[in-house]
C-alpha cells in the first residue's frame, strides 16, 4: 500500500511540473522583429479639405514605407518614413492630386506578456514623435481656364505607440500595431480674413487634430534573418481647428524584413 501511495505521489509531481516545462521560453527581444523593413501597398483613400471644397474626393493610392527597428535589453526604437501620392483622386469629373509624407520615431519598451491559449502575447509600449505633411491640388476646369487651387497642412506630434505580438510558432507571428498623437503643433492653409484672430500654426490636443495609424499583420520567417509579412493598414489624419481637413485610407501591404 505504501509503495502504491509513493507511485501516485510521484506521478502527481510529474503532472504538476509539466506546465513549467511547457511554459513559453521566448522573450521580448526574441519575438520583436528588428532590422530594415521595406513595404509597398495599395488602398482606398478619401479626403475632404473645406478650405477648398466641402466635397469628398476618393480613389486608389499607393503606399511606400521604409523603416529601421532596433531593440535590445527590453528597449529600442523605430525610425519610419512613409510616402503616398496619387493623381487619381476624384469627385465626379473633378480630379485632385494628393500627396502625404510622414516621418516617425517610436521609442519602444517591453510592457509584459499575457497568455492566450497555449502561447503568450508580448506587449510593447512607448512614446512617439511624428511629423506629417499633406498637399492637395484640385483641377477645376472652366471654359477657357484650368484652375488648380491648392491646400496643404502639417502636424508635428507627440504621442504613443503600442505593439502586440503573438508567436504562433517559430515561423509565424500575428502582430498588431497602433500609434496615436496626443499633443500636436499644427498648421494649414486657411482663410486669413475669416481667421484673423486665430492664426496658424497652433498647439492643439488630440480633440482638434488627430493622426492615427493602425495595422494588423501576419509575418512569416523565410529564413533566420529574412521575413515576409502581409498586413491591413488603417490611417486617419484630421485637423479640425480651422476649415476642417480629414483623410482616411484602408490599405493592403506587403513587407520584406531583413534582420541585420
Where in the sequence are the language-model features?
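Extracellular loop and loop/strand-boundary signature of outer-membrane beta-barrel proteins
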Residues: 47-56, 86-97, 143-150, 200-204, ...
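Short glycine/proline- and aromatic-enriched beta-strand/turn motifs that initiate or cap beta-hairpins
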Residues: 22-78, 86-88, 257-259
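Outer-membrane beta-barrel transmembrane domain signature
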Residues: 136-225, 236, 260
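Residues that define the transmembrane beta-barrel architecture of outer-membrane proteins
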Residues: 34, 56-64, 75, 95-103, ...
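Transmembrane beta-barrel strands of outer-membrane/channel proteins
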Residues: 36-44, 79-87, 125-133, 176-182, ...
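Residues on the lipid-exposed face of transmembrane beta-strands in outer-membrane beta-barrel proteins
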Residues: 40, 62-72, 103-113, 127-131, ...
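Repeated loop/turn-to-beta-strand initiation elements of outer-membrane beta-barrel proteins
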Residues: 72-78, 115, 168-174, 224-230
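Cleavable N-terminal export/targeting peptides
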Residues: 1-33, 260
